[in-house]
Regions:
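Signature of the chorismate-utilizing enzyme
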Residues: 1-138
Length: 138
């Protein structure tokens, strides 16, 4: 369950910079920025919902190096909440009979997802105003 807070704000770039800086204070964070402005003439607006989606802090995590997609499915079905994470290149070895063991330099698992405590959604409403929604886990 999440409690929602909405704010009308100005200066989207300033807010995005603050979100990125704030992400450094958490062990678990993810900041996703839209490239809609780069492709505005070519991309229908209905395909773009948010200019920025960010996740901070962690309620639960999933790390896997085997049977990863099955574990992700169970994790998702149990949590029924926002998930942020990453997939490694070597995860392909679980899909086909392939073998590689690429060193990523940070010893990340093949699959990693977390349920964030906070989700921030930033949407451009018009040229002068933006809407920031904060979804806090309760």
């Amino acid at each position: 369950m999440r409690k929602s807070y909405k704010y009308n704000i100005k200066c989207e770039k300033k807010i995005i910079n603050q979100i990125i800086l704030k992400s450094k204070n958490y062990s678990f964070s993810s900041v996703l920025l839209s490239n809609y402005n780069l492709h505005k003439p070519n991309m229908p607006e209905k395909y773009i919902s948010y200019d920025c989606i960010a996740a901070f802090d962690m309620i639960d995590t999933l790390l896997s190096n085997s049977n990863s997609f099955e574990k992700l499915s169970v994790f998702h079905n149990n949590k029924k909440d926002w998930l942020f994470g990453s997939l490694s290149y070597d995860l392909k070895n679980e899909l086909e009979q392939l073998s590689s063991n690429n060193n990523d330099g940070v010893f990340a698992p093949d699959l990693f997802f977390f349920v964030p405590k906070y989700v921030l959604l930033l949407k451009d409403k018009n040229d002068a105003e933006n809407e920031l929604s904060i979804l806090k886990a309760t």
